[in-house]
Every structure is written in C-alpha cells, then in structure tokens.
C-alpha cells in the first residue's frame, strides 16, 4: 500500500505541476544548500569513506539525475585517469581503443559513452570545454586527474545547463581558494612501473598551495595547482587477417576460407603530461564574489612500434598443408604458404608517432547578491586548444616461406622451423619497401559570455525563477597533409621491369649501397612470455624519425635502380598546401536563452519538489569548400566502340562553395522528486536535448566521379566494346548542412539512502533519437558540356536515421558497520547497467550482395558491412554500445589502512564495419547474378568491410594506502592485476573469427603524499 500511495502521489504531482531541474550550473547547488549538504565543489579530506558520503549527498540532494565521484583529498581521485574514474560510474563505459584507430590501444582509455551513447557534453567547472579537432568534446585523457576535486555525471540535464549532451553531461570540478578555511598545501609524488616495459620507470608529481586573506579591501584567496606525469608502457599485439574464400578447395567441392596470414607487433608508448591551474577569488563585500581561473593541460604523446605486417596480394594462390577447418570451412590450424609467388609477402615496419597538444581556459566569474531576492552572475570564458602531429612509417619487405598457425586456443600460436627463424633474421632477405607520412595541425578557439539571474520567492511553493543568456563564438581550423597518409613505394615487386618508370631490381639490404639503417627486433617477453615469435629485421627508430631527410635518401634508391634514367618520378613529401581536401575551416555562433522555475510542495504527505524550464538555442555555422570533378582519361572511343553517345561528357570542375546554416532548437525540461521519507525518494525527469555534429562531419568537400559501363567481345584488334551507360557517383567528405541530432530522454528512479555512505538506487531510462548522422545517398546535379543536367549519386553524411536506447541501472554501496569488530571497515560498491538499442535508417539500404562499384553498393558496405565473398551482413547494433556493464569494488578502511579492489566489465560491442585491418579492395565476387561472378582477375575491384567487435572485457585494479601521520601517507596502486587481454573479432559468414589480441600487462604505482 505504501508504494501504491507513492505512485498515486507522484502521478498527481506530475499532473499538477509540470516542472523540473538541477541547479548546479550557476556554481551553486541550491537544493543541496537547502538541505544543509555541501556544495558540489566541496573538498573532502578524510578518506574514501568520506568521499563516498560526499558523493552520495550530491546525488541525494541534487535537482537532477546525477552520479558523482569526489576526491578523497585534492589530487586524489581513485584512478590514474579521468576516463578510468568515469568508468566506475553506473551507466558509463570506457573505450579502450585509440580514438578512431581500433588497431591500437589507448592505455588510459580514449572516450566514454553514457547509457550506451557517445553524445556526451563535457564541461570544466560548469563551462563548456573541448579539445581541438572535433570542436565540441573534451578528450578526457588529456586532463590531469591530479587537478580535479570531483567529477559529476548528469544524465538528464535541465534547461539552465549548456546544451550539447543527449546521453549526458560530464562536469569536471576543480577547487577554489574559498573552499578551504585557510592555508592548504599538498604535495604528491609517485613512480609507475609497467611489467611489459621493464627498465622504464615513470615518475609523477603534483603540488597544491592555497590561502586566503582578510584585508581592508575585502577577502582575497589564491590557489595554485601544478601536476606533471610521465607514462611509459608497452603494448603487445597479434592479428589474424580476414579470411578469403577458396572456391571448391574443400571436400566435395566445398569452399574453404583461409586468412592471408597472421601478424604481430610491439609498441613502446610514452606520454608527458603537464597540468597548471590557478584560481584567484575576491570578496569585497558579503554580497559580491569574483573568481578568476586559469587552466592549462598540455601533453606530448610519443610511440614507437615494430610490426610484421601481411601484404599478400595473391591470396587465391595460397595453399594450406596439414589443414584443420571448422564445419563451415574456416581455417583453424595448418601451414600456410604461397609457392607460386616465391613466398608470402610481408613488411617489417618501424612506425613512430609524435603528437603535441594543449588546451587553455581563462574564465572570470562575478556573482552579485543584489538583495535577499535577486542574484546576478556574469561569466566570461576563453578557450584555446591546439594539436599537431607527425606519423612516420618506414618498412622493409620480405617473402616469408611459410607460416604455421594454430587458432584453436584463446590466442594464436605461431610455430616456425629453425630454417624459417634463420631466414627472418638474415638482413640479406629484405628489401626497402615503402614510406608513409602523415602530418596534421588542428586548432580551435572559443569566446563565451553568459549572464544568469535568479529571483528567490518568499512563497511556500515557488522557490526561485532563473533566466539567462549565453553567447559563444567558436572557430576551428583543421589542416592535414594531402594526401593524408602519403604511402609511397620505394622498390616494390611490381616496379621491376624494363620500361619507363620501372626498376631493374629491388633495393635488397645485401647490396652495400642499401644496407644501412636497419636492426634486429627480438620481441623480448612478448605477451609476458606466453607467445613466442621470431626476431626480424626492421628499419631503425632513427630512420623513421628523421623525416624528411631519411625518406629522401631511401627514395633515392628507386632513382639509382631506374631502368630508364630520367623516367622514374622523384619522391615528393606530403605538404600543407591550400588544397581544400586538406583544410577544414568552421565558424560557429550560438545564442542561447533559458528560463527555469524551481518549486516545492513541502506540506504534502509526500513532499514533491522540482523544476520546469525551457532553453532556446540558435546556431549559425559558416563553412567553405569545393566540389571537384576530374574527367576520366579512359573513355572508350574508336570504330570498335558502340554506344559511346550514352556517356555524358563533363568538363573539369573545381567550384568553390560557401555555406551558412542556421537552426533553432527549443529544449524543454522537467524534473520532479517525491520524498517518501528521509531515506526513500523517487524521481521523474523528461527533457529534450541536442548534440551538434563535430567539425570533421561538417567539412564542405565533395568529389564527383564518372565510370563507364560496358561489355566486350572478341580479342586483340577484333575486340568489340559495347557501352551501356555511365555510373555517376560521388563522395562527400562532410556535409555543411547537417543538423544536430536531437533526443528526448525520460528517467524514473527509486533511491534508498539507508546510511551516510549506504544506498540502493534503481533507474529506468529511455532515449528516443532523431536526425542521427549516418552515411547515406543524395543527388548532386551537374550540367554536361551540352548543357544537359545529370544527377550524381553522392555518398556522404546526412541526418538519415532515428533510434532509441533504453534500459535499467542498479547501484549499491555500503560499509558494514553491523559486523563483528574485527571485520569493521569493510564496504562494497556494485552497479549493473542493461541497455537495449536500435537504429533505423530513414531510407533503408540493404541488399544481399555488395559489388563494390556503384554508390549504393558502397553505402551498403559502410552501413551493413560486406564479406570477402561480397555478401552483406546488416542488422548491426549501435556502434560502441555494450548491452551489459558491471562494476564491483571491495573496500576496507580502518585506522591507518585503506584498501580497494575494483573490477570493471563490459560486454561485447561493435567497433565499426569498415575499419583498417578488416577492410580491403581485393575480395572475390560470389554473387551468382553478378557479371564478375568468380572472376578472379577482377578481384581487386571488389571492396569489403567486416563488422569488427571488441569481445567482453573485464579488468581488476587495486590500491592499498597506509596513513603514517594525519599529514603523510604512502601507498601502492595496481592496474590490470589479472593481466587481461583485449580481444577483437571479425564477423564473416563462416563464423565469428578472432582478429586481434592486445595486452599491456599489469602496471604498479608507488605513491606518497604530504599535506601541510
């Protein structure tokens, strides 16, 4: 009956009031103050139990659906990175792959999703923050956790919050000098050690100083916080290439699927990160407070990698000895070879990447309490962010005689004969193969001003009304070299010949002219000694880093071996030209207005409070670019050609385009809370939100292409060509006319707070999404030379889908004070999230086969995925969404000892359908209705892309600290205690096949801190 009365009361309240909110965005948490709770930026100084109490108070007293993590002390968040901290929050998952590159791991995570969706807004102290590149989101791995006082995750933000997050909003909080009673000092130092990267310690340290003074001009406060850290780890990685169909090679003429081979590599990763934060406060009177803050995060990321990479082009010639196959015909074990072509083509490459990034934030906040009713707050912010990088890859080549693989275990097993091991270690078997460089320079700048006004009512129901305005100008400029990744062969097998542009032979290392610049890579302790791989010859680190000088030397070998001197083109480095394909300039202006009413019915049997609000946002974007068309050079002509008139003739085109886009969004919100008693409460929240496309999706650059459809009969001079028409297609790099994705979010929660650090909460949520950005088809009209208009079918991003994500969250935490005395101090935290989702295209693209030529087939590949036999997949889940997520932690805190063991697990999720490593252009067409059916000579025209998944992954971390004095403590932290391997699988029609295995090994950190 109690729960029935609660439901009735909640329903009556929802009908009677229509309102909702969360009031932290103006730097205060009024609901928390009303209840006597600390503000969201309160400093907690008494261990992990007190930190949990503080976070629980924020959640319990907030006007919104929020989860928080509070630092035990300044600079003492419970993990080594912001992304790892966020992954402990119920409903939040962390991506462990490098951003946009599932072929590499991000040691501390590259991004997060909230409730399965990546539309996350990021803020620093309630202000929008971002990293250069996308322009709308902050790379959390760039932010030093040592500078943070807490992290809040708002899952259904209200009208007064800055727009931008459909799945949620993450607010990073730093301390202010008035948060402390007087002087505060803290010094922390640590040393990290990676079990895979032996002999490479990584020191870190941070220092905070804060004080406040009373003067004749009012009270002043100053705070300085500096953090510097080094990260040195190693990633060991193994890969199995996609499986290709060998038609009729199995028993009774069945098809066998055989991979091109297997690969391995090892990466040494270094990062230096520096964070600086300063805050100054002035309170000239009790009614006026001003705060000036400066925040800067900068880092240098450098990694060096040696990899043995498969480059086999004649997969159809590969043979298997002693083969073991699955019932579907997929290769499981055996020895792979390519005797018809002298061995399996492999490259041994040395790749280095050096990226430098920085983000600066200047902010000024002035709050004036005009009288007991009126409060006015003005806030000014300037953000500047930039990043630039060099990615350099130099490779040698070798023909591997054979490769013996066993893929029946948890990870691949390699077996090499003594002769194969000796062959790989001999430099004379290698030649200089290729170079590839990529450079980028990205910057973003924002100026923002907002004014918030609050009027407090003297009324038993109406508490206050808030309204305000926010203006922002955001500019972004992204520049890349063109071509973006400038792959250039040095001496490739297909270069060998006697004609113009050919070489007489390859530049083998056995030739004294070409012998320098290599070393033997031995892969010591690979996968912690669990996997044995042979040594191989690689270019040195110095050769890879000495761009462009080393590149010029290597490509000189091509000139030295030129069969016809003067006909071999010189190497040209990639440069930052004004080519519009390499430049993306975006200007964005936003004008936002909001109003929000807070209320409370405290006299009801079950008190109800909440807020209702509306936010209006106008967004104006300006971008410029080009539409480009280059006429084909091989149009059929001559007396043996019929139907040539069916091919329209277009002139070359490079048309500058300028776009200005305006869109208006009205974002209502409602938050209600019903208090059943002092411990049990219920919430209902509904809001509309938006997420703007990032700058990369808005690039205004479209390339148009024309290809001829024809059939041929006869041979030689008797060949007769019949032209049947032309394919008019195009590719849009971005779409400057994109609108924001919008969503309507609904939350219903039950929250039981049975102790200061004890709670059991349950949430049901639903998010309906509209205008999801996906690749789709649209027409571009172009006149031919005769003035006739023709439509090119262009593939590019558009607002072409809708969908939903719904599910439940359960969270529990408690310290067990009722247990016998010898067990006191033990506590646990646990959470579980279940998400269901679906995405539906507005104009579905789905066919059983992909042919890789027409635009519709390319779109089929990009959305549904295509196998190496050209069958499509379809019915794929939302990218990056794990259906289940689990967190569990055991804590102990008593006397001077404090420990924690924390386990984080997420279920399988889709990484993408057209990723490097699981895509290509050399599939075979087994579509029986296709004109290229089983045409092995045309296989290089068939594009494929396999759905790539990360399998379920769980990681155990731990820490133990000892408090020697109230001011000094020392401790040990550990990550990945169970040495868990990250596994990726690729889906093919013959099964879910292993593609990649990654390990970083356990990491340990010794830490000492002193407060003064």
Residue spans of the language-model regions?
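Short loop/turn motifs that connect adjacent beta-strands in outer-membrane beta-barrel proteins
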Residues: 161, 177-183, 214-220, 287, ...
């Amino acid at each position: 009956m109690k729960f029935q009365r609660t439901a009735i009361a909640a329903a009556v309240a929802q009908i009677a009031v229509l309102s909702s909110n969360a009031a932290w965005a103006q730097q205060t948490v009024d609901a928390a103050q009303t209840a006597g709770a600390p503000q969201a930026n309160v400093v907690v100084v008494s261990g992990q139990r007190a930190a949990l109490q503080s976070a629980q108070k924020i959640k319990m007293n907030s006007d919104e659906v929020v989860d928080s993590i509070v630092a035990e002390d300044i600079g003492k968040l419970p993990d080594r990175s912001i992304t790892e901290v966020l992954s402990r929050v119920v409903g939040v998952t962390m991506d462990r792959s490098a951003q946009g590159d599932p072929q590499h791991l991000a040691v501390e995570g590259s991004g997060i999703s909230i409730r399965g969706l990546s539309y996350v807004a990021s803020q620093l102290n309630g202000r929008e923050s971002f990293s250069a590149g996308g322009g709308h989101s902050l790379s959390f791995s760039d932010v030093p956790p040592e500078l943070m006082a807490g992290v809040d995750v708002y899952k259904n933000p209200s009208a007064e919050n800055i727009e931008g997050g459909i799945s949620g909003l993450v607010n990073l909080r730093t301390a202010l000098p008035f948060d402390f009673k007087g002087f505060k000092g803290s010094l922390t130092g640590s040393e990290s050690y990676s079990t895979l990267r032996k002999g490479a310690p990584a020191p870190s340290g941070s220092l905070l100083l804060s004080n406040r003074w009373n003067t004749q001009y009012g009270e002043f406060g100053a705070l300085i916080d500096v953090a510097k850290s080094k990260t040195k780890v190693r990633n060991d990685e193994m890969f199995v290439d996609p499986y290709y169909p060998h038609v009729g090679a199995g028993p009774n003429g069945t098809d066998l699927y055989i991979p091109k081979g297997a690969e391995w590599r090892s990466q040494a990763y270094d990062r230096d990160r520096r964070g600086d934060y300063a805050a100054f406060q002035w309170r000239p009177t009790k009614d006026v407070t001003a705060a000036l803050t400066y925040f800067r995060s900068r880092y240098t990321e450098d990694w060096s990698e040696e990899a043995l990479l498969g480059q086999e082009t004649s997969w159809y010639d590969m043979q298997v000895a002693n083969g073991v196959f699955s019932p579907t015909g997929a290769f499981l074990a055996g020895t792979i070879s390519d005797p018809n072509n002298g061995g399996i083509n492999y490259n041994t490459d040395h790749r280095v990447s050096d990226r430098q990034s920085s983000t600066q934030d200047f902010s000024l906040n002035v709050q004036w309490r005009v009288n007991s009713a009126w409060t006015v707050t003005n806030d000014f912010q300037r953000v500047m962010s930039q990043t630039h990088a060099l990615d350099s890859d130099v490779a040698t080549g070798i023909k591997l005689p054979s490769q013996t693989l066993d893929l029946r275990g948890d990870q691949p097993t390699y077996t090499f004969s003594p002769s194969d091991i000796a062959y790989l270690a001999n430099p004379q078997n290698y030649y200089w193969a290729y170079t590839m460089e990529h450079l980028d320079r990205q910057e973003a700048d924002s100026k923002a001003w907002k004014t918030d006004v609050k009027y407090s009512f003297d009324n038993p129901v109406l508490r206050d009304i808030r309204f305000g305005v926010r203006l922002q100008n955001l500019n972004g400029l992204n520049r890349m070299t063109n071509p973006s990744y400038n792959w250039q062969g040095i001496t490739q097998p297909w270069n060998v010949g006697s004609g113009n542009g050919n070489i007489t032979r390859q530049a083998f290392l056995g030739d004294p002219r070409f012998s320098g610049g290599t070393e033997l890579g031995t892969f010591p302790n690979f996968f912690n000694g669990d996997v044995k791989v042979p040594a191989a010859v690689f270019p040195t680190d110095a050769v890879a880093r000495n761009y462009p000088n080393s590149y010029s030397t290597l490509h000189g070998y091509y000139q030295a071996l030129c069969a016809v001197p003067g006909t071999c083109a010189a190497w040209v480095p990639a440069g930052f030209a004004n080519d519009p394909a390499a430049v993306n300039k975006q200007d964005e202006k936003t004008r936002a207005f909001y109003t929000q009413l807070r209320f409370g019915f405290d006299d009801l049997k079950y008190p109800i409070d909440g807020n209702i609000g509306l936010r209006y946002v106008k967004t104006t974007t300006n971008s410029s670019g080009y539409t480009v068309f280059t006429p084909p050079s091989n149009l059929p002509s001559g007396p043996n050609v019929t139907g040539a008139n069916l091919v329209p003739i277009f002139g070359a085109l490079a048309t500058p385009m300028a776009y200005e886009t305006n869109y208006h969004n009205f974002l209502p919100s409602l938050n209600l809370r019903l208090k059943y008693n002092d411990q049990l409460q219920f919430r209902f929240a509904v809001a509309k939100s938006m997420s703007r496309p990032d700058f990369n999706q808005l690039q205004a650059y479209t390339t148009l292409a024309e290809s001829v459809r024809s059939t041929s009969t006869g041979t030689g001079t008797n060949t007769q060509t019949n032209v049947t028409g032309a394919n008019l297609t195009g590719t849009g790099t971005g779409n400057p006319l994109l609108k924001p994705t919008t969503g309507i979010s609904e939350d219903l929660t039950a929250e039981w707070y049975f102790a200061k650090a004890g709670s059991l909460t349950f949430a049901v949520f639903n998010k309906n999404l509209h205008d999801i950005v996906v690749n789709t088809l649209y027409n571009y009209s172009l006149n031919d030379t005769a003035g006739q208009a023709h439509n090119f079918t262009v593939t590019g991003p558009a607002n072409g889908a809708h969908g939903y994500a719904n599910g439940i969250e359960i969270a529990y935490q408690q310290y067990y004070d009722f247990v016998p005395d010898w067990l006191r101090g033990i506590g646990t935290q646990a959470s579980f999230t279940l998400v269901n989702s679906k995405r539906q295209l507005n104009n579905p693209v789905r066919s059983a086969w992909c042919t890789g030529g027409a635009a519709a087939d390319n779109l089929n590949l990009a959305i549904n995925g295509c196998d190496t036999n050209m069958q499509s997949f379809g019915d794929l889940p939302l990218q990056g969404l794990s259906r289940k997520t689990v967190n569990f932690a055991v804590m102990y805190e008593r006397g001077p000892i404090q420990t924690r063991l924390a386990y984080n697990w997420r279920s399988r999720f889709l990484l993408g359908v057209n990723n490097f490593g699981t895509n290509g252009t050399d599939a075979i067409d087994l579509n029986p209705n296709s004109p290229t059916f089983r045409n092995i000579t045309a296989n290089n025209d068939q594009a494929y892309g396999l759905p790539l998944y990360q399998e379920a992954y769980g990681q155990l971390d731990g820490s133990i600290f000892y408090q020697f004095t109230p001011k000094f403590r020392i401790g040990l932290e550990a990550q990945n205690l169970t040495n868990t391997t990250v596994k990726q699988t690729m889906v093919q029609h013959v099964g879910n096949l292993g593609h990649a295995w990654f390990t970083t090994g356990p990491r340990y950190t010794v830490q000492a801190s002193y407060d003064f």
